[in-house]
Amino acid sequence: MSVRAHTYVQLSVAGALLSLAVAAPPAAAGQGHAVPLRVATYNIHAGTGSDGVFDLDRQAAALRALGADVIGLQEVDVHWGARSGNLDVAGELARRLGMRVSFAPIYSLDPVEAGGPRREYGVAVLSRFPIRSETNHEITRLSTQDQNPVPAPAPGFGEVTLKVRGVPVQVFVTHLDYRADPAVRVAQVADTRRIMARERAALPGARQVLLGDFNAEPSAPELGPLWKELDDAGTGTGPTYPAAAPVKRIDYVAVGDGVRVEGAGVPAEATASDHRPVVVDVSLVRKGPGRD
């Protein structure tokens, strides 16, 4: 599957998302042979905004303004430390938004004090739909917690399975390596393709959506293999990083077969995190006159 061009609008969190809402009603209203769904991805910088202030209420408001049914989050702290008030950031955001949550830690460290919660950092999925199953897959990583790391399999590639008006959907959330040398990202893309192919074969007919911070721009050679099987739903939208004055598009919604992109945008949210979110309206195309 090649990268396709779509019709897009540049959005502001304050109000322009309504234009997408008119074009694609909430998923609960799906009828006929296609089911509408709004998905988003957001690197939340562990709850800290581009102004250096930790403020979960502000981030919850930014997430709520997206009006998304499913949101992938990166840089999520769960009792990680003082920078996020030792809070379960994934759980706190889910509670504020009234959504289900699945957290997939990349790192899970012993507590500072005996009997305390483990210190964890990773990715998460927020969903308005019940989460039928969840898996934390391993992909190649170069640990930031080791003094002399070597590339090795490590967790933090999250997957949840949902059913949206009868259509099974596999949602994956990822955060690829940030280093200038693309070698680890090359391995991570290969791992991602292998895992998604295996999961697709295990649940025939499931639609697939990949949400994440890829730490590379769309034309980066290491992302090329990914676009053989997935569409970059954000083609034509604006840059996402850094949030205050973005110059790079490194945050993505990518979709597989049976998922049609209806519109996408990068809301002009410049303060709640150091990245801007990406929001996409899709239609889950049914295979026939009945449900899958």
How should these model regions be labeled?
Residues 6-13, 17-120, 186-190, 285-292:
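N-terminal, active-site-proximal structural segment of metallo-dependent hydrolase catalytic domains
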Residues 37-44, 59-84, 126, 160, ...:
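Active-site beta-strand/loop signature of hydrolases that rely on acidic residues for catalysis
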Residues 42-45, 73-76, 104-108, 128-129, ...:
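Active-site-proximal beta-strand/loop segments in catalytic clefts of secreted hydrolases
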Residues 48-49, 78-81, 109-112, 179-181, ...:
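Active-site environment of divalent metal-dependent phosphoester hydrolases
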Residues 94-97, 118-134, 246-260, 283:
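Conserved beta strand-loop-helix elements of the APE1-like EEP
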Residues 130-167:
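Active-site catalytic loop in hydrolytic enzyme cores
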Residues 161, 183, 196-209, 215-292:
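Metal-dependent phosphoester-hydrolase catalytic domains
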Residues 163-185, 190:
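Metal-dependent phosphoester/phosphodiester hydrolase catalytic core
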